[in-house]
Amino acid sequence: MSKVEFKKETGPREVFCGLTSIVWLHRRMPDAFFLVVGSRTCAHLIQSAAGVMIFAEPRFGTAILEEKDLAGLADAHEELDRVVNDLIERRPEIKTLFLVGSCPSEVIKLDLATVAEKLNKRFLGQVRFVNYSGSGIETTFTQGEDGALKALIPLMESSNEEKLLLVGTLANNVEDRFKKIFRNLGISNIESFPPRQSTELPKIGKNTKVLLTQPYLSDTVRDLKHRGCDIISAPFPLGIEGSTQWFLAAAKAFKIGELKVHEIISPLIKRAKLALESHKEILKGKRLFLLPESQLEISLARFLHNECEMDLIEVGTPYLNKDLMKEEINLLPDNTKIVEGQHVEKQLDRVRNSNPDLVVCGMGLANPLEAEGISTKWSIEMVFSPIHGIDQAADLAGLFSKPLKRNQILTSKTLVTH
């Protein structure tokens, strides 16, 4: 392991809650519906993040907890039953309904697990109900997906059939390219979790080899291990380096030689390196500060330093699972400073004192930092953009070169007021 400096920090934090993950999960599984049991604030958050107007009837919604519910003056369970009945009647195409806990439902101790159990009996054979928490008390941002996948694992049947299981939501076109490469390598039985249809859950067992596509799935990994799955240790497929090591790790697990892997991915690497050059010219030597939000920060830091030659000031991450991130940490330069958790005021002081060229942060911090003359990039864009794989390396670098390029254009000469 490289000589990395680890620090843990606690205090006030500035991150999205786990409800945000509904935005990409509902697109991934079009036969599922995500019902948040929460406040109007929860509803506004998801609707704004998804960019979908509610009259478009998206596959998510919020059962609003009113003041009388929070005060214990009404039976929230009865009201939730009514909402679910109306929803199923209105949307008969729903096959899986996720009951998603929020801060308000956690505060009043609403037992969504029991609610889901009762609803499963009532709607047996029609709709499947599962529950998880997206509460900001318990989760941050991407951990919502971890909770959703963990909730589905008990529903997955057992099988000893050998297969490669890609775990973590990917853009469909990226996933299709990955599967094509694996088939060219000779791995024919490949499935994904979450699947594209919520009712088509993969079967798992002792011959299931799990390859993670996202670094924020600690609980999911633990439960898959308990089901006997073998977890392949690898960096994550961000950039040329990470994706190459990711493919090599999968090939090794299936006893496929490295030469075969390089033969198949070499043309992709050659094209990606050429496409990366223009972004590298802008990013090279620039100082980068990553604030914690998505748990992608360590992988992004590795890519931006090793392939784009940026200098790392500090790499923040909401949580750090050293087992899952071991291969990533090994690729970081010596003396990289990784800070787990957050005390937002202290971290902002370090940002100002270090004079970075670019700060990767949440939307809530971006505008104030921009007002201070500090260039920023929203971390949420990394989750909503198709950034995985060798052939996406230039697009990934472009997300970071764009704000720096913008600043080069918006000089004091172009910002003259009349």
UniProtKB/Swiss-Prot annotation:
Pathway field: Porphyrin-containing compound metabolism; chlorophyll biosynthesis (light-independent)
EC identifiers of the protein: 1.3.7.7
Top-level taxon of origin: Bacteria
Cofactor notes: Binds 1 [4Fe-4S] cluster per heterodimer. The cluster is bound at the heterodimer interface by residues from both subunits.
Gene Ontology BP terms: light-independent chlorophyll biosynthetic process; photosynthesis, dark reaction
InterPro entries on file: LIPOR_BchN/ChlN, Nase/OxRdtase_comp1, Protochl_reductN
NCBIfam families: DPOR_bchN, PRK02842.1
Function: Component of the dark-operative protochlorophyllide reductase (DPOR) that uses Mg-ATP and reduced ferredoxin to reduce ring D of protochlorophyllide (Pchlide) to form chlorophyllide a (Chlide). This reaction is light-independent. The NB-protein (ChlN-ChlB) is the catalytic component of the complex.
Name of the protein described by the UniProt record: Light-independent protochlorophyllide reductase subunit N
Organism of origin: Prochlorococcus marinus (strain MIT 9301)
Organism ancestry: Bacteria, Bacillati, Cyanobacteriota, Cyanophyceae, Synechococcales
Protein's gene: chlN
